[in-house]
C-alpha cells in the first residue's frame, strides 16, 4: 500500500527517510546496530517505490495539500496519507468563523477526501497543555477530547489513537481511544525506551467481541 506524507517538521526529507528506514528494518544507523549496505539498499528501493512526500512552496493551506494528495492518488496510487501535524498547515478561517466551526469544516473536508478516493487519512494533532494534579503531581492521560481546538476531533474520527511518552520511566504507551466499528479491535501498546520491548495490555478496552461459549478470543494488535 503506497503512502504519502505531508510532514513539514521532517524537513529535509532525507532525515525523514532515515527515520522510516530505521522503523522499517528495526535497525539503527549506528555502528553495531545491524544496518548493512544490502539492507539499506533494499529499504531505499522499497521507499522509492511506495513512499511519496508532499512539499509546497508558499502557504501550505489544506486545499493545496489535498490537491497534491489527489495527484498522488492518480499518479502514484497512494491510498494512505499522513498529515503531520495539523498545526503546520496554514489555516485560513472565513471572517467571523469560530475555531470550532473552522475545525469542524476542515475535518469534513478531510473525511470527504478519504471517502471519495478510498483512502486512509491519518491526521496528527497535539493536545492542549495538560496540568499536573496539584496533590499527586501526576499528569492525567491525554484523551482525544483533549486535542486542542474542538471536541470534533473525537466526534468525527473513525479511529483515534493516543501516543503518550512517559519520559520519567522511559515508556511509550499507545492507546486506542476510538474505533468506529468496534468489532474490529481493541489494544494498547506499551514500548520501553530501554529494552525496546513491546507489550500488549488491555489498558483501554474498546470492545468485547461476541463469541461462542468456550471459544478463545485471538489477540488483537494494532
Q: How should these model regions be labeled?
A:
Residues 5, 82-83, 119-126:
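Structural recognition of the conserved hydrophobic beta-strand(s) that form the central parallel beta-sheet
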Residues 52-116:
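Phosphate-binding/switch loop-helix module in NTP-utilizing enzymes
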Residues 23-27, 85-92, 113-116, 124, ...:
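Conserved, well-folded catalytic cores of nucleic-acid-processing
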Residues 13, 103-107, 146-150:
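Amphipathic alpha-helical segments in well-structured domains
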Amino acid at each position: 500500500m503506497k503512502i504519502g506524507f505531508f510532514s513539514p517538521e521532517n524537513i529535509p526529507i532525507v532525515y525523514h527517510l532515515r527515520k522510516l528506514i530505521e522503523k522499517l528494518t528495526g535497525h539503527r544507523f549506528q555502528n553495531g546496530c545491524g544496518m548493512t549496505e544490502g539492507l539499506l539498499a533494499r529499504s531505499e528501493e522499497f521507499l522509492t517505490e511506495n513512499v511519496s512526500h508532499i512539499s509546497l512552496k508558499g502557504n501550505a493551506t489544506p486545499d493545496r495539500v489535498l490537491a497534491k494528495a489527489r495527484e498522488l492518488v492518480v499518479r502514484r496510487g497512494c491510498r494512505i496519507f499522513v498529515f503531520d501535524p495539523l498545526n503546520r498547515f496554514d489555516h485560513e478561517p472565513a471572517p467571523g468563523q469560530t475555531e470550532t466551526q473552522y475545525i469542524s469544516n476542515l475535518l469534513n473536508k478531510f473525511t470527504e477526501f478519504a471517502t471519495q478516493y478510498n483512502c486512509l487519512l491519518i491526521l496528527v494533532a497535539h493536545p492542549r497543555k495538560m496540568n499536573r494534579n496539584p496533590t499527586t503531581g501526576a499528569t492525567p492521560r491525554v484523551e482525544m477530547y483533549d486535542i486542542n481546538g474542538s471536541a470534533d476531533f473525537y466526534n468525527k474520527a473513525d479511529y483515534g489513537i493516543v501516543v503518550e511518552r512517559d519520559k520519567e520511566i522511559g515508556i511509550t504507551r499507545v492507546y486506542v481511544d476510538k474505533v468506529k466499528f468496534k468489532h474490529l479491535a481493541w489494544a494498547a501498546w506499551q514500548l520501553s525506551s530501554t529494552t525496546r520491548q513491546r507489550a500488549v495490555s488491555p489498558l483501554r478496552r474498546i470492545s468485547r467481541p461476541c463469541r461462542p461459549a468456550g471459544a478463545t478470543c485471538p489477540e488483537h494488535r494494532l
